Structure formats: structure tokens, C-alpha cells
Amino acid sequence: MSDFCDSGEVLAQKGRFYGVYLLCSQSLDARYRGKCYVGFTVNPKRRIGQHNRGCDFGGAHKTSRKGPWQMVMIVHGFPNNIAALQFEWAWQQPALSTRLKCYPELRRKQPRETHFDYNFRIVNRMLGIGPWHRLPLTVRWLESECERGFVVPLPPHVRIVSGKVAITAKQPEQAVASNRSLECHLCMQRVEPAERCRLLGCLRASCPLTCHMLCLASYLLGDQPGQYIPIGGTCPLCELPLSWAELLRRQGGFTETDQDSDDVACDELSDDVPDVDSDVEQQLTP
């Protein structure tokens, strides 16, 4: 699936989107043009506006007066803001990251390599190693002219797509159908009202499977010692092949929309998690 690229805007529910983005400077000043910046956001459209307006309007100090900036790609699908911020830091600091410091070729930009190519090479490697290679991540291209293939093959469950992101406060339709039981089919325990928003079911609409997220994860992991995030398996009821990434995407309130659909006033929405990134610019040598 990682070789497939679709297009169109994605509609993400407020409070459930965590992304790590890459900016490229379009400055007319040769000192800054082509430089890159990695950051974290819960609202990409709002964040790029902040960067281009300057630090007085919420942008980062390192990007002020070095733009205009273009957000060319974003990696999203992280389970929470902590996981996204850890990914952001490792992307910014490959020489210091515990996961990446064993790859000496990532420590610095190669001769004649652009800043964008260097950052792309880092994230390509990151997506293929733990713990990130087991997460249900999506690589989203925001600028078509920057799209390129991945030299290091990505895990098959990682999606490569293109199109913008809009954040909405609208609640998604309930993923758990009304005809499903109020007991977990795996642990046979009653589902408490507070747990219903975290239930998972089968990808087949006619299958009545209802499970706690942890119960289904444990079932799909089976005899994989030391692993905590499943990749996939089969439905315990109807035996349909299941992708853990797709289960979480459906549960997480993501909806694909047409490119010409109306934006959802994402600039006017306040988010539970602020756009606070580490404000670390890539220190690149010529």
C-alpha cells in the first residue's frame, strides 16, 4: 500500500490530528532560500499561516523573516501528541536520536544535496525503523512538485497520499453500528459508556464484532513477544483480513473528501493541543 498515492483533501476531527511537517523556504534572499524547518502541528493550515506571519503571530523564531515558507509534506496518524513530538525531535536531531545515531550517513547533508533532499532522506529512514515502522502513519504530500519516490521501502501499511488537511469540530459518525453488542467479543466484559468511543469493530459492515482496543490488539499480536502494536490479522468472527492501521483510521475520525469541498473554518478552531514545536531549525552545513 505504501507505493499507492491518492489525492484529495482529508477531513480530520479536532483533537485527533497530530502531524509533523516539513517547511521549505521560498525566500528571495539566497541566504535562506531552500532552507528547511521541521515542526509539529495539530492544524496545518493555521500553522503555515503563523510561520509566514512571524513569531509575533505564533510562528517560530527560527522561521521569522526567512520566508515565505511552503509546507511541502506532513506525516500524521500518530496516536497522541507525545508520539508526534518524539518523531519531530528525532527528525530534527538525527545525530542525537537514540534510534538514528547508528546511521552515520544521516548526521550531515551530503555535498550537492539540497536541504529538502537531506530532510527527506532522514524521514525515509525513520519510517522504516522502530518504533515508527509499526505505527499507522500517513505520509501526505502537500505540494505536488516536491513529490518523489522513497529509496528505502516503507512498511506496506504506511500510506502515501497527496492533498490538503482540514480540521473540523464536527463529530464523526459512530464507527460502531447500533446492532453491535455492548460486550467485548474477546474478553466478554461489559463495555462501559466511557469506553464506547474507543471500541473497534470489523472492517466488514455486516460483521457484529465489538472489541476493546487493547483486547483486539492483543488478539492480533498473537505470539509476537515484545511487540505492542499489531500490523494486521484476521477478524475473530468473520475471518476477514484486518489492517490495524485502517482500523485506527476509521476509529480516529478521518474522512476523505473531494478537493473542491468547502474548507471547514479550520483557522477559527481552537485545539486541545497547541502548536508548540521544538523551534529547532536544521543546522545544515553547505
UniProtKB/Swiss-Prot annotation:
GO CC annotation, single: Slx1-Slx4 complex
Compositionally biased region (Acidic residues): 257-280
Subcellular location: Nucleus
Matching InterPro entries: GIY-YIG_endonuc, GIY-YIG_endonuc_sf, Slx1, SLX1_C, SLX1_endonuclease, Znf_RING/FYVE/PHD
Swiss-Prot/TrEMBL keywords: DNA damage, DNA recombination, DNA repair, Endonuclease, Hydrolase, Metal-binding, Nuclease, Nucleus, Zinc, Zinc-finger
SUPFAM superfamilies: GIY-YIG endonuclease (SSF82771)
Names of the cofactor(s): a divalent metal cation
The protein's enzyme class: hydrolase
Function: Catalytic subunit of a heterodimeric structure-specific endonuclease that resolves DNA secondary structures generated during DNA repair and recombination. Has endonuclease activity towards branched DNA substrates, introducing single-strand cuts in duplex DNA close to junctions with ss-DNA.
Family, as annotated: Belongs to the SLX1 family.
Protein name: Structure-specific endonuclease subunit SLX1 homolog
Organism expressing this protein natively: Drosophila grimshawi (Hawaiian fruit fly)
